[in-house]
């Protein structure tokens, strides 16, 4: 293996039941300092590839090995942490060498007071310890820990791991890994469970990171701003593309032109995203306003019939009237924490509202109040007479693992009636990228992203005209994300979407609802980038820096 590479794979293959070649004959070499984003459909083998590279999965064909002496750090989708540890104890494992050096240095200083000490030996040890501390900026160790904890919005230092949610555990594991500073980072969906500000911080951190980074992610701004290479997994093959995500889109469109006969819908979807990428910010802003202006056209039967040829199609519900949702002076608390404090806003016809904020800030609580599942402490929610809600929540466990994909959606019916439309059930399921034999897969065999698509297919068949989408982008591959964006943009109704995906919010949002500290929620007209720019101008750069969320305490 050439010393110019930190890692080499030679003819790597992987077979999974029932005799499916998920990876085929992959040969790749990784440069020091390279930043690589891994793309591919759900189930394409992205996580398998990282497990092989991390040395976790040893059952594969071919060779995969790092350069001798290279330290590899791996973030799996479900990292393992010691349940009895506190958050601080778990994170400090990453800097144990520096902490031990600091402790020992204090002991060495104390030993100088002994007149019988071997001063030459102590001086040599002192020099060695100081070199370790200086290399890791050890005298500022506490500041490093606090900055990282704030940036990733970690729970309190004293919180026990066993009491944390899955998302909180992932953030702790990510923080620990980044502080270790290995030569090569293997990250499986590092942006999952991070809010937009934490993702932006991670993006800057990895952009400046001196080591090699291989990241599976669906965050396309992340792929645009960090990645210098895209590794696409397509039908078992690993195809490297030099450039970032936007560059990959350009190259991919040219390749699809050569496969036009079989890829028409996919090419149409990529072309729409490319059109958006090529627009300047003013053009993007004008496009979001144009969506609301052409609301009547979106509602026409002829337009929706044309729209049915898209990759993913959200069936329209009843025609929406002028009044949609009005929220006035809404307040909601749990225990002594105020989640929402005096919130008022009005959703105009045709709006797509992106909802952002830290995990646990109360975004899903708002949806439960809008749908009548919970009541506010004070204030009111008023729905227009024509409003029919369709809700897609972030929990996808309410499916029967023994059923096939087709059975789960269709309940055995050949024809589905969705809103004012009738559609063959297999064609409808196919719209969510379950083609042919994939419709016969058991639900229990699906990957996280495939479950996400199935969940969308089930709940969108209700045919509402106002969609409440709670983290619909979680675990979706980039292809499905793009199709979902296009489907929402063509939907003849309104949508409120909880998401941390900045690219997604920039493409679809006409308004932003931002959950800040102490129950303060801001309603802004414009997409995510417009809102961030406004925040910087209004509140300064500090406003867009992540920090651990503060809850307003209720006066006793």
Swiss-Prot record:
It is an enzyme of class 3 (hydrolase). It catalyses: ATP + H2O = ADP + phosphate + H(+). One of its GO terms (biological process) is translation. ATP 1 binds at residues 40-47. PROSITE patterns: ABC_TRANSPORTER_1, ABC_TRANSPORTER_2. GO terms for molecular function: ATP binding; ATP hydrolysis activity; ribosome binding; rRNA binding; tRNA binding. It holds the Pfam family ABC_tran. GO terms for cellular component: cytoplasm. It is found in: Cytoplasm. Coiled coil: none annotated. Residues 96-140 are annotated as: Arm. ATP 2 binds at residues 357-364. Its EC number is 3.6.1.-. Residues 243-323 are annotated as: PtIM. Keywords: ATP-binding, Cytoplasm, Hydrolase, Nucleotide-binding, Protein biosynthesis, Repeat, RNA-binding, rRNA-binding, Translation regulation, tRNA-binding. Signal peptide: none annotated. Residues 7-260, 325-551 form the ABC transporter domain. PANTHER family: ABC TRANSPORTER-RELATED PROTEIN, ENERGY-DEPENDENT TRANSLATIONAL THROTTLE PROTEIN ETTA. NCBIfam families: ABC_ABC_ChvD, PRK11819.1. Monomer. Probably contacts ribosomal proteins L1, L5, L33 and S7, the 16S and 23S rRNA and the P-site containing tRNA(fMet). Belongs to the ABC transporter superfamily. ABCF family. Translational throttle EttA subfamily. This is Energy-dependent translational throttle protein EttA. It comes from Haemophilus influenzae (strain ATCC 51907 / DSM 11121 / KW20 / Rd).
């Amino acid at each position: 293996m050439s010393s110019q590479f930190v890692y080499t794979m030679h003819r790597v293959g992987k077979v999974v039941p029932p005799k499916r070649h998920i990876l085929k004959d992959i040969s790749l070499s990784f440069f020091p300092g390279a930043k690589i984003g891994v793309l591919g459909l759900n189930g394409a083998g992205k996580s398998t590839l990282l497990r092989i590279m991390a040395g976790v999965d040893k059952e594969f064909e071919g060779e995969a090995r790092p350069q001798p002496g290279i330290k590899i750090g791996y973030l799996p989708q479900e990292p393992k942490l010691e349940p009895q540890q506190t958050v601080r104890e778990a994170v400090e494992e990453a800097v144990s060498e520096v902490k031990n050096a600091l402790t020992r240095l204090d002991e060495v200083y104390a030993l100088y007071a002994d007149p019988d000490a071997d001063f030459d030996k102590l001086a040599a040890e002192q020099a060695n310890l100081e070199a370790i501390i200086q290399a890791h900026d050890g005298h500022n160790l506490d500041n490093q820990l606090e900055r990282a904890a704030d940036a990733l919005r970690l729970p309190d230092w004293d919180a026990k791991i066993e009491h944390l949610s899955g998302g909180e555990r992932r953030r702790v594991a990510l923080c620990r890994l980044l502080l270790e500073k290995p030569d090569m980072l293997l990250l499986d969906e590092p942006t999952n469970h991070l809010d937009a500000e934490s993702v932006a911080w991670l993006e800057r951190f990895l952009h400046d990171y001196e080591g090699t980074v291989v990241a599976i992610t669906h965050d396309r701004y992340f792929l645009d701003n960090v990645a210098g290479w895209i590794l696409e997994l397509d039908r078992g093959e690993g195809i490297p593309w030099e450039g970032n995500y936007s560059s990959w889109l350009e190259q991919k469109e040219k390749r699809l032109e050569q496969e036009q006969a079989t890829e028409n819908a996919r090419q149409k979807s990529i072309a729409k995203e490319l059109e958006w990428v090529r627009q300047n910010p003013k053009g993007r802003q004008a496009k979001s306003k144009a969506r609301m202006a052409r609301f009547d056209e979106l509602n026409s039967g002829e337009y929706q019939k044309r729209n049915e040829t898209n990759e993913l199609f959200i069936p329209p519900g009843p025609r929406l009237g002028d009044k949609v949702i009005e929220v006035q002076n809404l307040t909601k608390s749990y225990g002594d924490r105020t989640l929402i404090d005096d919130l008022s806003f009005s959703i105009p016809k045709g709006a797509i509202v992106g909802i952002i904020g830290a995990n646990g800030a109360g975004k899903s609580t708002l949806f439960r109040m809008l749908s009548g599942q919970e009541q506010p402490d004070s204030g009111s929610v008023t729905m227009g007479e024509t409003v029919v809600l369709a809700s897609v929540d972030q929990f996808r466990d309410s499916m029967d693992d023994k059923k096939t994909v087709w059975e789960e959606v269709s309940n055995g019916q050949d024809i589905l009636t969705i809103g004012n439309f009738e559609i063959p059930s297999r064609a409808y399921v196919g719209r969510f990228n379950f083609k042919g034999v994939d419709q016969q897969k058991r639900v229990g065999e699906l990957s996280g992203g495939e479950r996400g698509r199935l969940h969308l297919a089930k709940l969108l068949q209700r045919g509402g005209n106002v969609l409440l989408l709670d983290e619909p982008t979680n675990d979706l591959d980039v292809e499905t994300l793009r199709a979902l964006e296009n489907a929402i943009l063509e939907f003849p109704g309104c949508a409120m979407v909880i998401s941390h995906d900045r690219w997604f919010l920039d493409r679809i949002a006409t308004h932003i609802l931002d959950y800040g500290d102490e129950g303060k929620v801001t309603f802004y007209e414009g997409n995510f980038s417009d809102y961030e720019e406004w925040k910087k101008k209004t509140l300064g750069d500090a406003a867009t820096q992540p920090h651990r969320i503060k809850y307003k305490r209720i006066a006793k």
